[in-house]
């Protein structure tokens, strides 16, 4: 039986903090097990990628316990920050790093050099790298000159779903994602302000505790006159609750500054929901193209001039 040791962050199954990366990791583990692999999962404590000494020590212990020659699949949130634990073990283990978002893509200016150096060392020592989009593979090449043949793309799948009935008025907007600077909720509210004369309401579904100061600012902005009572923040939703949120929507809106893929995009499309999203990262791969090779609705930005 083929074996794989999978190292994932603490909280991977926490319903209060859902994420596309956690969902992807969990589905990979289940998929490998369904194919007959023996999956040995190791959850590492800490607030990765900013885990403290205890988290890094736990990772080092976990890696040292893995037998020689084993395949080790590591979530990039962990791996990309831990060259001290991983690089010395690279000759002994077949390390495969799953990069959801390169930490070196948009790090804080005062940390950029150190963040990129650590990620570069880990990826250079890895046996292979897996990304969730072709955009991410290209970005790793730009950042670290990784040969394309060492970086494998495994796009997320999407479950089939019934068509979302939506609303009679057709004015229900839905934004799914943690309220963080990267997801651009401030940009979304600014855009909604420009169409305040139209009929719409927007439900924002996602964790509010990832960047609490930012989330508080966004929510205060949503309470101002032109947006009051039109934008709601419900916190995270998973399973049937998230299904109901999709079913009640007429349009998915996504204002992210960076996305390696955008699993919520394919979740919406699977339900027949149209999507209006920023043209960043791998979002265009998630959206796909029409038969003529163009993205449906690409000219919608010109519709209100």
What are these regions (language model features)?
Residues 257:
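Aromatic "clamp/platform" in nucleotide-sugar-dependent glycosyltransferases that forms part
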Residues 274-277, 284:
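Short hydrophobic beta-strand element within catalytic cores of glycosyltransferases
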Residues 201-219, 235-236:
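Glycosyltransferase donor-sugar binding loop
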Residues 59-86, 96:
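Short N-terminal targeting/anchoring amphipathic segment
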Residues 236-237, 244-249:
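Short alpha-helical donor nucleotide-sugar binding micro-motif in glycosyltransferases
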Residues 109-131:
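Membrane-proximal helix-turn-helix segments that form the acceptor-binding/catalytic region
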Residues 166-183, 189-194, 203:
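Conserved donor-binding/catalytic core segment of Leloir-type glycosyltransferases
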Residues 135, 157:
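Carbohydrate-associated surface elements
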């Amino acid at each position: 039986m083929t074996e794989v040791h999978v190292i994932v962050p603490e909280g991977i199954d926490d319903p209060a903090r859902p994420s596309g990366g956690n969902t992807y990791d969990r589905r990979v583990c289940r998929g490998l097990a369904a194919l007959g692999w023996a999956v040995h999962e190791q959850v590492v404590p800490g607030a990765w990628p900013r885990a403290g000494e205890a988290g890094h020590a736990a990772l080092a212990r976990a890696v040292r316990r893995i037998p020689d020659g084993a395949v080790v699949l590591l979530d990039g949130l962990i791996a990309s920050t831990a060259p001290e634990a991983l690089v010395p073990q690279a000759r002994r283990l077949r390390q495969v790093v799953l990069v959801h978002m390169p930490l070196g893509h948009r790090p804080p200016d005062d940390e950029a050099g150190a963040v990129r150096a650590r990620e570069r060392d880990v990826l250079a020592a890895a046996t292979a790298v897996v990304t969730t989009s072709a955009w991410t593979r290209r970005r790793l090449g730009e950042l670290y000159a990784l040969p394309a043949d060492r970086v494998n793309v495994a796009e997320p799948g999407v479950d089939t779903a019934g068509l979302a009935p939506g609303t009679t008025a057709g004015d229900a907007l839905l934004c799914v994602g943690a309220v963080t600077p990267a997801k651009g909720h401030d940009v979304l509210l600014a855009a909604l302000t420009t169409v305040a004369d139209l009929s719409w309401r927007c439900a924002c579904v996602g964790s509010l505790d990832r960047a609490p100061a930012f989330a508080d600012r966004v929510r205060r902005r949503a309470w101002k006159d032109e947006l009051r009572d039109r934008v709601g923040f419900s916190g995270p939703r998973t399973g049937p609750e998230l299904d109901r949120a999709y079913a009640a929507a007429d349009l998915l809106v996504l204002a992210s500054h960076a996305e390696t893929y955008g699993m919520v995009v394919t979740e919406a499309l699977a339900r027949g929901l149209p999507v209006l999203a920023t043209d960043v990262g791998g979002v265009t791969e998630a959206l796909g193209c029409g038969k003529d090779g163009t993205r449906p609705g690409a000219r919608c930005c010109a519709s209100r001039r």
